[in-house]
């Protein structure tokens, strides 16, 4: 079957391939291990602007955090859970230290904090729009911190 520019599934697949390819290349150029596992039929109903905002903001942050690590990596996974009506978008990456302060809130370690934080606010706004969750977690074993994001319910995506 040929690509159909009027088919939302074809558009979603193309958007996915373009964005993931862009970040895979950035990671390769920066010696960051990059893994992506995006299951079929998981993102076609997410509008392109929302998909792009979620992935670009999260992957930009993941690259930033991973650059200072001895063994930098990013794992990107998208799958369906709960009988296929809930999407799980998970981005996990290495990080030198937890981005969460003692108060449990994100704190910027960037020198220029003027525009810092808008990306994650955008991700949260999109998750809220679809009755999803935007969850930041940290953890790890063997002294390797791990940061990640998970969220988004597909139940209210436009058909």
Where are these regions (language model features)?
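Conserved short strand/loop->alpha-helix "switch" segment adjacent to the catalytic nucleotide/phosphoryl-transfer site
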Residues: 8, 12, 33-54
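Short beta-to-alpha transition helix within the HATPase_c
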Residues: 10-30
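Conserved ATP-binding N-box helix of the HATPase_c
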Residues: 48-72
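Short beta-strand/loop element within the Bergerat-fold HATPase_c
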Residues: 73-85
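Glycine-rich/acidic phosphate-handling loop/turn and adjacent ATP-lid/helix
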Residues: 87-117
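Glycine-rich nucleotide-binding loop
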Residues: 97, 139-147, 153-154
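Conserved glycine-rich
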Residues: 132-133
